[in-house]
Regions:
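An alpha-helical, amphipathic repeat domain used for nucleic-acid recognition
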Residues: 1-171
């Protein structure tokens, strides 16, 4: 029964060992049986927290454009230890993270916002920096990127032009 539960869970989507342990506990599988089944799945590499963490970071950083801080929290919630999480997060460069943040801000910047009006600019800054903070970006980085994008938008130039980035790399 425990093996069938684990297989069904892994068929739906990749899972960490802790997620599978929790699911087995929900189904009242004895701990020793759960441990034995999960150990066997780990031996045949069907349960591999390092591989799960790598996949999770790749997927979430591309689809949701989350920063390392948010990804680290998500991995911890899924039972991934700090060393494994750090290794998985190593695949994200500072440049990738900054480009993702810049792309988010440019996409969320409302067309028609009057950036010459100080109150409107402050409102846009707060809204965009808060959005980046919710995605795990550091406040200093968030405010810097928002200011750069707003300055570029106020000047009428796409923000990617003055940053030396190729907009084709943003997607």
């Amino acid at each position: 029964m425990a093996r069938a539960i684990v297989l069904r869970q892994l068929t739906a989507s990749p899972k960490s060992r802790l997620q599978l342990e929790r699911k087995l506990a929900e189904r009242n599988v004895p701990e020793d049986v759960a441990a034995a089944v999960l150990d066997r799945f780990a031996e045949v590499r069907l349960v591999d927290d390092a591989e799960f963490a790598d996949m999770w970071v790749r997927s979430r950083s591309q689809s949701r454009r989350l920063a390392r801080g948010a990804l680290r929290r998500e991995l911890a919630d899924k039972g991934i230890d700090a060393d494994t999480a750090a290794s998985a997060l190593g695949q994200l460069s500072d440049e990738d993270e900054e480009a993702a943040a810049r792309h988010l801000v440019e996409r969320k910047l409302r067309a028609g916002t009057d950036l010459s009006d100080r109150a409107e600019r402050d409102k846009a800054t707060r809204r965009l920096a808060s959005m980046l903070a919710r995605k795990g970006y550091q406040p200093s980085q968030a405010f810097r990127i928002v200011a750069e994008v707003l300055d570029a938008a106020a000047a009428g130039a796409p923000a990617g032009e003055d940053s030396g980035e190729d907009p084709a790399d943003w997607e």
